[in-house]
Amino acid sequence: MAEKPAPEQEQEQTRAMEPAVLDDIIRRLVEFRNTRPGSGKQVHLSEGEIRQLCAVSKDIFLQQPILLELEAPIKICGDIHGQYSDLLRLFEYGGFPPDANYLFLGDYVDRGKQSLETICFLLAYKIKYPENFFLLRGNHECASINRIYGFYDECKRRFNVRLWKIFTDCFNCLPVAALIDRILCMHGGISPELMSLDQIRSISRPLDIPDSGLVCDLLWSDPSGDVKGWGANDRGVSYTFGADTVAEFLQKNDMDLICRAHQVVEDGYEFFAERQVVTVFSAPNYCGEFDNAGAMMSIDESLMCSFQILKPSEKK
């Protein structure tokens, strides 16, 4: 495994962003709270500022492991998909960092109207609070996917394709899983190739998401009540896994729970396999097409899990 960088080197890399510049970016992004919903207003960030967010956060991702080992208390959020106003609502509810520790499970971009604000806000917090704020990679943090589902077009419309490529380089360095005591977190799910967590630890970055195999499954697989063992996935990528597969995996690896995102669920969270898997989805009224709530899972010091719900808005 790569050695941890020497403290002075680490200092050098994380010092690459002036605290005053970072705080000003965060201030502008938070001020968006005061704008009228649906006003179409955007936060103004310069291309240089965004490039810096990508470069500095990328260094931090690479200094931290690909399988994060985190401690409770922590709040876990699922897909955001460019729904920036809802991301701000989540923080209003759970506390803006560093009042609470956070782990996000991926899918920051695509589909929603404000992928740029969403990802820039999250990267800014990652830089400001690197030991309290964590971001995993979702299947949409991948060039071949976000080229199609909106992020590329947003970057091109508001800036240029070059900036989209810089985000791609940053996304290729994101961690893919996190362990919080006996809770394993990832965007999608488990993999038929995953026997031991050391397999994840040994993956090197930067990394393109392959079309199949362990990393692909961690970001793409889904639980299914209709299958025993492993089944085909309607997405045309990866697999579905049954409750029996989950029980066997958890027992073998001495774990209690798999926490994942990746699927819209009506109440914002949903258990599967006798509460051995939980899906957390944090974009309410997803795409304006669903009536789902969004949720955030809080894990306290004693590893008790509770849920905070963002109700879908009444307006049609």
From Swiss-Prot:
Stored InterPro entries: Calcineurin-like_PHP_ApaH, Metallo-depent_PP-like, PP1_catalytic_subunit, Ser/Thr-sp_prot-phosphatase, STPPase_N
Cofactor: Mn(2+)
Disulfide bonds: none
Matching CDD domains: MPP_PP1_PPKL
Catalysed reactions listed for this entry: O-phospho-L-seryl-[protein] + H2O = L-seryl-[protein] + phosphate; O-phospho-L-threonyl-[protein] + H2O = L-threonyl-[protein] + phosphate
Gene3D superfamilies reported in the protein's UniProt record: 3.60.21.10
Annotated catalytic residues: H140
CC terms in the record's Gene Ontology section: cytoplasm; nucleus
Enzyme Commission numbers on file: 3.1.3.16
GO molecular function: metal ion binding; protein serine/threonine phosphatase activity
Main EC class the enzyme belongs to: hydrolase
PANTHER family per UniProt: SERINE/THREONINE PROTEIN PHOSPHATASE, SERINE_THREONINE-PROTEIN PHOSPHATASE
Protein name: Serine/threonine-protein phosphatase PP1
Taxonomic lineage from the root: Eukaryota, Viridiplantae, Streptophyta, Embryophyta, Tracheophyta
